[in-house]
Amino acid sequence: MNKLKLFVTGDIGCYTLGFLPPLSAIDTCVCMGASIGHAMGLDKALGEEALGKVVAVIGDSTFLHSGITGLLNVVYNRGAVTVIILDNHTTAMTGRQDHPGTGCTLKGEETFEVDLAKLAKSLGVKHVKMVNPYDLAAVERVVKREVKRPEPSVVISRAPCVLSRRERAVSGKPLAVDPDLCAGCRSCLRLGCPALAWVKEEGTNTRGKKRKGRSKIDAFLCNGCTLCAQVCKFGAIKENDGR
C-alpha cells in the first residue's frame, strides 16, 4: 500500500499491527467495521480527489461481524470505494476461533460456510476479485486497477493463517540470504518477518556495492513464503536446501 501511496483505513484484527513500523501500512483504526465507513466518508468528502487514493482493509471475521452493513452503505450511496477483505479463514487475533466463513461452529462441527465473493455480489458489488497475498506482483496489479474504479469494488486476499492447524498454510523450503549478493538495502527487513535479522558487517558485496550490514534468515523460523525473495532486487535470497 505504501508503494502505491494509498491512504489505508484500517480495522480491528491481526492486520492492525501493520500500523507500526516497519510496515506502517495503516492510517486509521477506530473500532470493528469502521474501515469501510471511514473510506466512504473520505470518498464523499473529497470527491474525485479521493479516487485511486483510498482503500479500506478488513479481516474476514470482522467483515462478517460488522462490515457487511458498511459495504451495503457504499453500494447504496454510490461510493467509489475499494474494500480489501483479508481472508485467512479464521478469527486470528483473538485465538483462531471459527466464524460463519470457516464452515465450522465453535464446537468444531461442520456447518454452512459463507462465500464472501457471493455475499459481496449479493450486496450489489459488481467488481469482486480474488488474489493470493503471496503473489505480490499480482496483488499490486489488481489493487492498482480496482482503486481507480468510480464505483464499489472488493478484493478478497485469501490464504490460510500460518498458525492454522486445520488448513495447510503456505509451506515451502526455507530460504537463505547469499551474503555475497546482499546489498544491505533492508528491503526484505521492511516486511517485518520474524525469520529475518540484520547483521552489522561493513564492507562490500561481490558487485562492489558498499554496505553497513546484511540480512540473514533463520531457517528454523522461515516457512518458505518467498515474499522476501520477491522484494529483493539483487537476487540474493534463494532456497536453502538444509535446515
Where are these regions (language model features)?
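Active-site lining segments that contact anionic ligands and/or coordinate catalytic metals
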Residues: 5, 78-81, 125-128, 149-154, ...
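Generic long, charged, amphipathic alpha-helical segments
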Residues: 44, 50, 174-181
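Conserved helix-loop functional segments at active or binding sites
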Residues: 6, 14-17, 41-51, 194-202, ...
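Cofactor-pocket helix-loop regions in the catalytic cores of large enzyme subunits
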Residues: 1-20, 65
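Short glycine-rich anion-binding loops that position phosphate/pyrophosphate groups of nucleotides
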Residues: 14, 159-162
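Thiamine diphosphate
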Residues: 19-156, 164-168
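Iron-sulfur cluster-binding cysteine motifs and their immediate structural context
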Residues: 183-216, 223, 227-243
